[in-house]
A protein has these predicted regions:
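Cysteine-rich, disulfide-bonded extracellular modules and peptides in secreted proteins
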Residues: 1-74
Length: 74
């Protein structure tokens, strides 16, 4: 989906630094990664968790496994 090609937008609220962990799909990496969101605005390449991001953007048969492997690699 086109939304998965958008770069993550931190969605700043005033001068407050972004501090809410969300997930975005990275076309370059081919999987989802975390980023900090400020709580206002942003774009639609934002997901509550890695699994929902992978399901939406890749339709991978085992999105939880991919997310688990990605988190363990960090």
């Amino acid at each position: 989906p086109a939304v998965c090609y958008l770069y993550p937008d931190v969605g700043r609220c005033g001068n407050n630094p972004p501090d809410i962990e969300n997930w975005y799909f990275s076309v370059e990496a081919g999987y989802c990664g975390p980023f900090l969101w400020g709580g206002c605005g942003g774009n639609r390449n934002i997901f509550d968790n890695c699994t929902s991001c992978m399901k939406y953007c890749t339709h991978h048969p085992d999105p939880q496994g991919v997310c688990r492997d990605a988190l363990n690699a960090e």
